Amino acid sequence: MTKPIEKNMLRSRAIKLPEVTESMWEQVDEEHRNLVQEFLDAHSFRDKTRKQYYSSLRQFFWWVHTSLNGKKLYKISKRDFIRYQSFLKNRGMSSSGIALKKAGVSSLNNYIENVVAEDDHNYEKFRNFTRGLPAIPKTTTYEKVKVTYDDYKLMMDALKEDENYLGMAWLATAFNVGGRRAELIQLKTEILDYPVPEGQSYVMSHKVFGKGKGEGKPLEYMINTEALEYLRLWHEKRGYDHEYLFTTQYGGEPKQMSESWADYFCSDVLSDILGRRINPHLFKASCITYLLEVKKVKIELISKYVAHHEDVSTTIKHYDLRDFEEEKNQIFV
């Protein structure tokens, strides 16, 4: 009998909003549809951001069509948008999901306020109605349970037994380097030729692009010798050369790995090994927490060189999963 996976859920996941089909979209006010297309065409968004904005704007304007009787965008008020946020919240959407939907509308509004308003008298007095609203109450669907070093070794041992060299390379890099899934797949094979400087236990990667406007924020990651060891093993075993380290074969042709591979690998392989829910986003926090908790590295250094944050408070708020058990045990001694 298969061992059940511990989900670590704090609340039920929201049911996805129904897709806004093409026939539904055709019913939306033509001006709104044109504004969405103009906005997307005017910006050099990353593919992922573009898809998110396109989806969220279709959802918003379908709601405007059905719930606000197709009210023109320039007539929509802050109160109307609060109603939209309530609509999303009442369907169980998490605070991060609502924030993502809000971001798409806010970005469109900024474009209209700064560009469209100059040429369209209807928008002369238009203001971004998503600004200055009450903060969205934070909700958490899954408890973040850190991947410990023991968890990491257990997974690596299981992958070694399976001769899953790609999995070992990805896991060793994710746990030791702390990059996001979209950043890891940008690592190039040339890294394996970089010499490790004397007195160091890492090499600096070439530039990869992280989250941010346009192509994204340029980042360089510290690739330690343990990650390099398993990257070399994978390179040796895969049997072909390629510009990128993380590759998979599609129709017999090797191609750069997609972001979704990490989702599958974590949910269908690593989760079964540990018996609890594992997702790619855990590894950045787990890497940072391991360096803080076990290696005792100063958080200022980790924040700057591993997390790539300008403010240490961002690292503490989102990625420090320490439980401080040793300190707590001193309280009632």
Swiss-Prot record:
SUPFAM superfamilies: DNA breaking-rejoining enzymes. Keywords: DNA recombination, DNA-binding. Residues 142-332 form the Tyr recombinase domain. The active site is at 180, 211, 281, 308, 319 (o-(3'-phospho-dna)-tyrosine intermediate). The keyword DNA-binding applies. InterPro entries: CB, DNA_brk_join_enz, Integrase-like_cat_sf, Integrase_catalytic, Integrase_recombinase_N, Tyrosine_recombinase_XerCD. Residues 30-113 form the Core-binding (CB) domain. Belongs to the 'phage' integrase family. This is SPbeta prophage-derived recombinase-like protein YomM. It comes from Bacillus subtilis (strain 168).
